[in-house]
């Protein structure tokens, strides 16, 4: 494996551990890195979705007894058809616009929600989550940070949020992989990265689940926000300079 591949696999491990601790966020870091190293959406998003399917599946198993299964049914109503409608459009997407959109979504996700919990009725929240996953998610890959807010229910414990978000995200990523395949985009484009990344995210989930109760939430939040800010600034720079016809490389 090249040094770049090793670095990407390490990011996969850390991103899965991050999501196992916080419930979300790790996927945004991973897709941000895949775009930052120059992968086109037709390569980056199918690879990312395949990896995230296993990451979220392992997290679902870790929090299985806390899952609210009705949420998956509402999610599927919009989450099943949407990816197949949007998949053919991915090939025509401009990677630099996607970088800007993803950077904006990352920064917007860090704005505190009013009241801290989601007031939208459950069924509409989960149907909206399915729609966002199958539309915007087909281009930016990661949806956890902005879809995750729809799962912050006042009656749910932290473990229920993590487990239920994980099972819907696993379903969403599987649907995206199938939709990409139907549009002719194969997850085997980077098979040399896929297998080690899958192993890394499963290991990261196990480690993250163990650390879940040990990490200070205040310290974790500061570190997490710092990583996301740096990553979003890199994506913003790449997007703006790319649209302007300039190029640069930080990593």
Q: Regions from the language model: what does each represent?
A:
Residues 1-7, 119-124:
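Membrane-interfacial loop-to-helix junctions in multi-pass transporters
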Residues 1-3, 38, 90-99, 187-195, ...:
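Interfacial loop-to-helix junctions that mark the boundaries of transmembrane helices
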Residues 69, 206-230:
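Interfacial loop-to-transmembrane junctions
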């Amino acid at each position: 494996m090249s040094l770049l591949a090793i670095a990407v696999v390490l990011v996969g491990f850390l991103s899965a551990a991050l999501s196992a601790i916080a419930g979300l966020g790790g996927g945004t870091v991973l897709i941000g890195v895949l775009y930052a190293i120059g992968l086109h959406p037709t390569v980056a998003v199918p690879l990312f979705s395949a990896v995230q399917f296993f990451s979220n599946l392992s997290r679902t198993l870790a929090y299985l007894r806390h899952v609210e299964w009705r949420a998956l049914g509402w999610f599927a109503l919009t989450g099943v058809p949407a990816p197949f409608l949007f998949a053919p459009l991915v090939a025509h997407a401009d990677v630099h616009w996607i970088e800007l959109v993803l950077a904006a979504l990352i920064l917007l996700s860090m704005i505190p929600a009013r009241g801290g919990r989601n007031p939208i009725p459950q069924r509409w929240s989960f149907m909206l989550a399915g729609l966002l996953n199958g539309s915007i998610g087909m281009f930016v890959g990661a949806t956890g940070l902005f879809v995750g807010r729809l799962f912050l229910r006042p009656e749910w414990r932290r473990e229920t949020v993590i487990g239920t978000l994980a099972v819907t995200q696993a379903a969403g990523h599987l649907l995206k992989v199938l939709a990409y395949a139907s549009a002719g985009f194969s997850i085997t484009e980077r098979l040399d990265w896929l297998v080690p990344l899958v192993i890394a995210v499963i290991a990261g989930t196990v480690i993250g689940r163990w650390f879940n109760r040990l990490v200070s939430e205040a310290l974790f939040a500061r570190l997490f926000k710092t990583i996301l800010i740096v990553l979003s600034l890199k994506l913003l720079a790449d997007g703006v300079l790319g649209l302007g016809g300039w190029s640069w490389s930080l990593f």
